């Protein structure tokens, strides 16, 4: 059971209801994470902006890049053992085309030798591993691989997603955010 009350749409103030409308437009429903974060509507709104402007904006234009974003999110959440974030992001990843083998490789420690991941995916997962373990500062080899496969903008974006999910993983675990039933989880919405 969550350590703080989850704010339902019926209980929400006008500002939060407006933010919730944006959540529904992005994800089709209001997750328990959003209901907890709604105690601070500005934080929830701040969470939504990069999702909309970076993640969802690429769904149709660059689905392979969205798969890489999902691998970064899955690796980060696996390292942090966040059952909540994994319960949403593994299904999101498979719905956009990640294979079970790719998801398993990203979650494990031997991803660099996995035939399921291509060089670009391995570079991103390795970077997420380094950022999450706080070793990226000194990992010039991992950064060189990122530079080989991604623009500087994409490197920043993938690092932002890793940071965002380190934040959400910790928030969900610290506040015991309740898992939704599988048929109540978020889904990418078409733009």
Go through each PLM region and give its residues:
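Iron-sulfur (Fe-S) cluster-binding segments and ferredoxin-like electron-carrier domains
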Residues: 44, 88-105
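Mobile cap/lid helix-loop segments that border enzyme active or cofactor-binding sites
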Residues: 1-63, 189-191
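Preference for long, well-ordered alpha-helical segments
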Residues: 152-189
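Acidic/histidine-rich alpha-helical segments that form the ligand environment
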Residues: 116-160
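Acidic/His metal-coordination segments adjacent to aromatic residues that form catalytic metal sites
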Residues: 106-119
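Short, thiol/selenol-centered motifs that function as redox-active sites or metal-ligating centers
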Residues: 69-92, 165
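Short acidic alpha-helix initiation/capping motifs at coil-to-helix transition points
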Residues: 24-25, 46, 81-85, 123, ...
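Alpha-helical scaffold segments that form or flank carboxylate-/histidine-based iron centers
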Residues: 32-39, 65-80, 156-159
């Amino acid at each position: 059971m969550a350590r703080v009350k989850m704010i339902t749409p019926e209980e929400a103030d006008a500002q939060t209801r407006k933010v919730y409308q944006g959540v529904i437009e992005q994800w089709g429903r209001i997750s328990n994470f959003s209901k907890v974060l709604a105690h601070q509507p500005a934080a929830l709104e701040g969470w939504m902006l990069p999702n909309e402007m970076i993640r969802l904006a690429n769904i149709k234009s660059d689905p392979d890049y969205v798969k890489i974003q999902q691998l970064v999110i899955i690796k980060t959440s696996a390292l942090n053992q966040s059952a909540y974030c994994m319960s949403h992001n593994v299904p999101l990843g498979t719905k956009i085309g990640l294979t079970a083998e790719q998801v398993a490789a990203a979650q494990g420690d031997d991803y660099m030798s996995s035939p399921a991941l291509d060089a670009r995916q391995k570079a991103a997962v390795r970077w997420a591993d380094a950022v999450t373990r706080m070793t990226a500062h000194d990992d010039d080899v991992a950064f060189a691989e990122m530079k080989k496969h991604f623009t500087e903008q994409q490197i920043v974006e993938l690092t932002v997603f890793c940071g965002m999910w380190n934040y959400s993983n910790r928030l969900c675990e610290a506040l015991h955010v309740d898992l939704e039933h599988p048929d109540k989880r978020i889904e990418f919405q078409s733009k």
